[in-house]
């Protein structure tokens, strides 16, 4: 009987692999399954395949694990670069090093049997980051042992996810054949996948409700070296979205990248020498410089989209954007190559991506990074949590597609009045049609992520369950189409792909449903994927397997009779195959021709020659079934992938419908109203911001036992600047944020929490709320505050919304007051943007006396007998007292400190009775 193969020596390294494979060639056919060998045959077998006794190596070459851990610090010793001679390595390790040289910046996972192994410096990295055992492996007689660490093949996704989260890129080297071809020493292996943070397709590695952006950026200095042009292209490989934009100024690019929060950013090698603008912000992956050249970029784009020229893209052939697009596609060609599709002998990516959409940097409401943090649009300012953000409050979507869509809307609100009103009207219709709204949401609730599912199918990485989910999603489209049988849905192009469902999709879903079982296995190579009756060859093989199973059942009964062992069972184990199991007490009664296979505590396991022969036949049939089912599945997956663009169009329509029904649900449940949006072309009214009884959309939902106090705002008609005064902790900052959030909600087309509203379109929203030291940059609180203020004053326009809170606190009283006063006048007289300036400097109330577009507002409080009550109501007029001492008392400051502060305040007021006054306006601000 053939000796079992040593899994380490036989499949991991070098010569033993070759010898075992040669032996295997000599044991084909019937000899391979002939387990009942005589003693003479066993001797002949041992002569053909001698087993070499393992002897210890030279003690000087053996490194124990403790020593290896100590030497892990000395990484250069274990780098593949420092090998004295690559030919001294075993064949498998030689191949590993060759692949590692091609992927020096990636962790190389090398498939060996049931594990992905890492060696040299990668093994040390893997061990540290994943906290797995670092072991060693013999690399050759002249080299000795080297570091080795590995992860199970079946758990590779989980471990790869951890590596990606830590910012690493991964190269997957998989086995390309089950066994070596004749004449080859090694199993054929090759790089099948490059996983980088921005090129992930695997479901478990992605956040369902966020886009995973891969970005490409290029900068180009003008001849005068003062103005920098830039282009930023971004793509989500999981959804196919492809957007490109251009701009000027490194600061603007910085804000765009902060807003984008890309998983990965690439650029041409050595093109960005000045790191000041992005250092500490992003990590840039350098890529082949020639891929970003204008000529090669054009060739890449034409090859990918099968175009004769690029004019149809609407991008100038000499623009920076052509280069960023071409570089991005080239990067995908490398990370996701489609080996089966070569055009002009060039490998194309198998990722299905849309045509690049040109984004006008002025087409949407601009919200800088500081404002995003201050308004807590997608995460809270304090701890970065989702709960408590605006998105948390208004996202009522039910699908992952819808969740990503509303995030995009809220991160980039539009200035398109027609688009806003269209969304508002659909929301209004759905608010009134509660039954329709509930039916649509019920249908959407179980909808899979068609965008990403179709992306995996297009890249030929989808599993059987992915295809079933795609079919289930498509099957819901006709029902949704019936729900959209209303005139209002015909007025928008959002839903064209649902209203006019492509017949090919229905046929595809039917084919998947008729062929793949309802709950298919995760593995694609072990069979059990398809129903009976879909392929005659598959049916014939399954018939053979049924015959073998019948024989197994009869064999169990027959062996019971022969052995008189009534509790005998014929069982199967993945490692041992088929065997006869009997209790320990009955083992002495087994027939002589039974061969003992395994002894357990309470059981003995045996095999018979006939059972082993039948097992070989069963394994052959199973292998043919698995191979055929995999071929059938790949054909079906390829067909599904060819429809990925059509599926994605339907998915985009579903995402819009999900967002709009969610916003309608929000409006209906929280008593929202439709704001009247004023077109920017209406000169007299375009800057109006009038909200009656507005409410903070987030705070209102957080309050459980209290009722939120609504407040009005009136800006843009006669008043451009509101000076808002009032005690500390009275709600001034909340009021500022409320106004900003309602403007953003209105410009995504949402209804808002208010009694009524008339709102003009804002081109930008700016906030300056609070500040902290930036220790990393060596900037004090006051300097941070001034930098933020300067940015606002240099970029705001008359159509902007500016929200300022307590400017001038970080310096002396007179300096702070002077700066606050001057900033207020600059906003009111020169920029004339719609602005609210919250302050504790009551002297600023005087500005309204000589500048007609300034008005004073205050937050009302009740103060009796040293007791302060916050009413949170904003009214016209200026406050004349800060009540800071009373706020300190409410905060829990010790009574002795509070009382002493009152005495000190009286003395200060007595000695400084004169108030600061400005008798005439500052002419320089005209």
UniProtKB/Swiss-Prot annotation:
Which residue ranges does the record annotate as region Disordered?
A: 1-60
Concerning SUPFAM superfamilies, the annotation shows: DNA repair protein MutS, domain I, DNA repair protein MutS, domain II, DNA repair protein MutS, domain III, P-loop containing nucleoside triphosphate hydrolases
Q: Compositional bias (Basic and acidic residues) at which positions?
A: 20-31
Q: What does the record give under GO molecular function?
A: ATP binding; ATP-dependent DNA damage sensor activity; damaged DNA binding; mismatched DNA binding
Record keywords: DNA-binding included? yes
Q: According to its record, what are the GO cellular component terms? A: cytosol
The Swiss-Prot or TrEMBL record describes its family as follows: Belongs to the DNA mismatch repair MutS family.
- For this entry, the protein name equals DNA mismatch repair protein MutS
From what organism does this protein derive?
Prochlorococcus marinus (strain NATL2A)
Q: Which gene encodes it?
A: mutS
């Amino acid at each position: 009987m053939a000796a079992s193969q040593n899994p380490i020596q036989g499949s991991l390294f070098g010569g033993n692999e070759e010898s075992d494979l040669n032996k295997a060639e000599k044991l084909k056919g019937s000899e391979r399954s002939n387990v009942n060998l005589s003693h003479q045959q066993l001797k002949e077998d041992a002569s053909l395949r001698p087993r070499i006794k393992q002897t210890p190596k030279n003690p000087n070459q053996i490194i124990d694990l403790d020593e290896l851990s100590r030497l892990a610090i000395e990484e250069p010793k274990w780098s593949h670069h420092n090998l004295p001679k690559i030919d001294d390595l075993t064949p498998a390790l030689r191949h590993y090093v060759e692949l590692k040289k091609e992927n020096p910046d990636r962790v190389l996972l090398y498939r060996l049997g049931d594990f992905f192994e890492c060696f040299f410096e990668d093994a040390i990295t893997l061990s540290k980051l994943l906290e797995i055992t670092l072991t060693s492996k013999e690399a050759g007689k002249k080299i000795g042992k080297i570091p080795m660490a590995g992860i199970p093949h079946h758990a590779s996704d989980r471990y790869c996810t951890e590596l990606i989260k830590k910012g690493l890129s991964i190269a997957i080297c998989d086995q390309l054949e089950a066994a070596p071809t004749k004449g080859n020493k090694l199993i054929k292996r090759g790089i099948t996948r490059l996983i980088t943070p921005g090129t992930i397709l695997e479901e478990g590695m992605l956040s369902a409700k966020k886009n995973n952006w891969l970005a490409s950026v290029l900068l180009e200095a003008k001849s005068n070296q003062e103005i920098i042009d830039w282009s930023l292209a971004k793509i989500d490989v999981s959804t196919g979205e492809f957007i490109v934009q251009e701009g000027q100024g490194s600061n603007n690019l910085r804000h765009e990248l902060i807003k984008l929060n890309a998983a990965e950013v690439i650029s041409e090698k050595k093109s960005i020498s000045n790191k000041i603008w992005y250092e500490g912000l992003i990590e840039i992956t350098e890529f082949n410089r020639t891929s970003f050249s204008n000529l090669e970029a054009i060739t890449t784009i034409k090859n990918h989209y099968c175009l004769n020229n690029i004019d149809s893209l609407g991008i100038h052939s000499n623009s920076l954007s052509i280069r960023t697009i071409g570089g991005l596609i080239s990067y995908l060609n490398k990370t996701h190559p489609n080996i089966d599709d070569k055009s002009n002998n060039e490998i194309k990516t198998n990722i299905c991506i849309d045509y690049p959409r040109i984004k006008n940097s002025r087409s949407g409401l601009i919200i800088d990074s500081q404002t995003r943090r201050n308004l807590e649009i997608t995460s809270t300012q304090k701890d970065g949590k989702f709960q408590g953000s605006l998105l948390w409050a208004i996202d009522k979507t039910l699908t992952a597609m819808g969740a990503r869509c509303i995030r995009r809307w809220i991160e980039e609100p539009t200035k398109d009045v027609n688009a806003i009103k269209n969304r508002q009207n659909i929301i209004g219709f759905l608010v009134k049609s509660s039954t329709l709204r509930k039916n649509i949401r019920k249908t959407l609730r179980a909808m899979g992520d068609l965008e990403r599912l179709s992306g995996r199918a297009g890249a030929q990485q989808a599993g059987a369950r992915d295809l079933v989910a795609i079919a289930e999603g498509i099957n819901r489209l006709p029902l949704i189409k019936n729900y959209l049988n209303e005139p209002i849905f015909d007025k928008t192009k959002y839903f064209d792909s649902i209203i006019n469902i492509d017949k090919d999709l229905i046929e595809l879903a039917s084919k998947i449903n008729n062929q793949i079982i309802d709950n298919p296995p995760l593995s694609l190579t072990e069979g059990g994927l398809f129903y009976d009756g879909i392929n005659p060859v598959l049916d014939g093989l399954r018939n053979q397997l049924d015959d073998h199973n019948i024989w197994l059942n009869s064999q169990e009964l027959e062996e019971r009779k022969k052995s008189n062992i009534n509790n005998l069972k014929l069982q199967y184990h993945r490692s041992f195959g088929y065997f006869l199991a009997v209790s320990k007490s009955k083992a002495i009664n087994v027939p002589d021709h039974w061969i003992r296979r395994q002894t357990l505590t309470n059981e003995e396991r045996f095999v018979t020659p006939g059972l082993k022969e039948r097992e070989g036949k069963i394994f052959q049939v199973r292998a043919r079934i698995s191979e055929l089912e995999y071929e059938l599945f790949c054909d079906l997956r390829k067909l599904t992938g060819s429809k990925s663009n059509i599926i994605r169009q339907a998915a985009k329509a579903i995402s819009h419908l999900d967002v709009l029904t969610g916003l309608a649900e929000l409006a209906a449940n929280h008593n929202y109203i439709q704001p009247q949006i004023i077109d920017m072309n209406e000169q007299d009214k375009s800057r109006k911001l009038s909200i009656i009884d507005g409410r903070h959309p987030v705070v209102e939902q957080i309050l459980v036992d209290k009722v939120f106090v609504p407040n009005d705002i009136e800006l843009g008609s006669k008043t451009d600047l509101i000076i808002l005064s009032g005690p500390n902790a009275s709600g001034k900052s909340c009021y500022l944020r409320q106004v900003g959030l309602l403007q953003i909600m209105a410009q995504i087309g949402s209804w808002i929490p208010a009694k009524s509203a008339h709102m003009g379109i804002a081109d930008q929203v700016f906030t300056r709320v609070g500040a902290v030291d930036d220790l990393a940059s060596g900037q004090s609180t006051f300097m941070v505050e001034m930098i933020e203020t300067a940015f606002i004053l240099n970029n705001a326009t008359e159509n902007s919304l500016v929200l300022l809170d307590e400017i001038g606190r970080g310096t002396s009283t007179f300096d702070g007051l002077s700066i606050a006063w001057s900033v207020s006048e600059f906003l009111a007289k020169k920029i004339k943007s719609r602005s609210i300036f919250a302050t504790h400097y009551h002297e600023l109330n005087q500005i309204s006396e000589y500048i007609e577009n300034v008005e004073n507002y205050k937050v009302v409080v009740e103060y009796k007998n040293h007791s302060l009550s916050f009413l949170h109501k904003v009214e016209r007029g200026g406050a004349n007292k800060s009540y800071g001492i009373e706020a300190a008392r409410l905060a829990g400051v010790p009574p002795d400190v509070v009382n002493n502060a009152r005495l000190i305040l009286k003395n200060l007021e007595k000695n400084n009775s004169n108030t600061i006054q400005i008798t005439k306006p500052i002419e320089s601000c005209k």
